[in-house]
């Protein structure tokens, strides 16, 4: 396992523990303070009101494994709303939330186009491979999120599972180049199933900064003649949320 892959796995594990650490860090302080009005407890305020939430975010990501030389930069707007009251299930108590996002900024930075030598039937041959910067946009219409019940007045941890669609102006990911209009290559349409964890940190009433880490898979589901995909990438997300 390369040092880069180990670093990405460390970041993912650290982010997964962050919500628990944050909630624990504030639990003692919260326990010492009498029940507060919603105005001074931003987390309880939006939880009880089941408030709509919306805001901008930006993602920076890195491919894993055989895609470790892929980098990603995405940006967009997210909209969501809790659909249930608090559901009690021990340490898993929390609220179910449904949301979606759109990313008009979708960039993938891959190695430059080059020629690659293949061995087939004992014979070596060379073919051109695409590459460079890929531009597109993405829509994630399904985000299922679980907001954990917390006593903290500032931290709201969560985990989520989601599914989206990606369109790129050129077939992605790069593969063996074929003449335009002929069969072969990958697809301009890809799917992006994903899952991750994160936390809202409330700066004040109805305003939070957000940090999340997602593991994202990108695949065309064989819409193209070839489907090498991006089996795994780690995406770090930073955002700002307004609650209404």
Feature-to-residue mapping (PLM):
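Cleavable N-terminal export/targeting peptides
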Residues: 1-46
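Residues that define the transmembrane beta-barrel architecture of outer-membrane proteins
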Residues: 50, 69-75, 133-140, 155, ...
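Membrane-embedded beta-strand positions of outer-membrane beta-barrel proteins
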Residues: 54-58, 96-102, 157-163, 195-197, ...
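Transmembrane beta-strands of outer-membrane beta-barrel pores
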Residues: 58-64, 102-108, 163-171, 215-219, ...
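Extracellular loop and loop/strand-boundary signature of outer-membrane beta-barrel proteins
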Residues: 62-65, 125-132, 177-185, 221-228
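Outer-membrane beta-barrel "beta-signal"
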Residues: 230-244
